[in-house]
Amino acid sequence: MAGTPSFQKLMALADSQSAQAAVQIEQLRKAQIREKAREITEERNRQRKLQRERELRQKYEEEQRRQQAMEAKRIAASTRQTSERPPLSAEEAKRIREVKEKDRLESKKNERQGKPRSYNELLRQASSAPAVNETSSSGLLQSKDKRSQSPHSPKKPVKNSSSRDQPVRNSGATSTASLPPAGLRAGRGSQISASLAWLKTGGASAAPSNPRQPPPTSNFSNRKARYASNGLVQLQTGPKRDKRSAGEVQDEIMKRRQNSSISQAATPRTVSNSETSYVGSPALKQSKPNSLKSNNTSRKTSASSAITKPKARPHTSRHDEFVVSDDDELNDRVPDVSSEIWKIFGKRKQDYVSRDVFSDEDDMEATGHDVWREEQAAARAARLEDELEEQRERERELAKKRRKNK
């Protein structure tokens, strides 16, 4: 079978297939080698690129650090130049001295004229002033004498000082308000410094034992004299605020009303009885003209006092208001000057004198006439406001037109 043609063909075919396979394998191997070489070259190129970028970044960072260092050096140099003050020239020093001298002269002038000083100036003067003796007034007088005899203290005429110190001599006797002899009187600056020192110590200085001066009447008068002598303003003057509650105030008003009603009920109505008896008897009218004059004068004085200080009338019901009392008839019959004056002004005196000042109804409630008057006043105010607004609007429009025409 070895020499058969079929076997030879098969062997040749196998050889050709193996050669083709070997060629294909070789081609595949070469292709793999080329692919591997290409990948290696790409990796090398990428590494070179990364290295180049790294180097560029390092150079950039170094440049930034160098610029920051230079900027810091420049800022330090500029700040050092600004902090270090250059030496003053002769002209600048002379100008500064002239300004200071001018300020000092102005302060002295203001002190002579007695102008008020600021709070900071007073505090500075008090801090620089000598210590004040708290137990006696001798140390205070000595310090005032030293400050008055110093060459820097301004000289004041004796006339002004005596006129300024005159109200202090009449006021209370305190450590700051007590006056030294004529040779030891100090200026206004020493008085202000002593008063501020007294305020800082809390007012602990004792009053001088002077037998000639009378004892102080009260703490309020002493404090008032002290502030008047030193030119300071006292805070919280006048009566204190009423700290009572609304209930306490109402209770006090009720007590006053009850007391007034009790007093009116206890007093007999002798005036009306005597007046009626006097009017009914004509013989008594002719026999006692002097008593009539005295009664008229006393009645006029009582009526005038009633105008200034009206009394509370007892509470009466509204159904009895139409009844005319004897007092009203008496007041209508007897001519009164004050009533005539009230009539001149278009008012009826009895309506105001007999008003109950403690009545809640009269004081707290408004009548229809009061409401109408308030409405009329509000309408007039609104109308006036509308007219003013319309006038302003017209003026604005005219101004706008003028601007457009220009």
Curated annotation (Swiss-Prot):
Coiled-coil parts of chain: 19-111, 370-406
Basic and acidic residues bias (residue ranges): 38-74, 91-114, 383-398
An example molecular function term from Gene Ontology annotations: DNA binding
Region ranges (Disordered): 38-188, 202-330, 383-406
Start and end residues of each stretch annotated as Important for interaction with histones: 340-406
Keyword Metal-binding: no
Quaternary organization: Interacts with tetramers formed by histone H3 and H4.
Domain notes: The acidic C-terminal domain mediates interaction with histone H3/H4 complexes.
PANTHER family per UniProt: PROTEIN SPT2 HOMOLOG, YEAST SPT2-RELATED
Protein name: Protein spt2
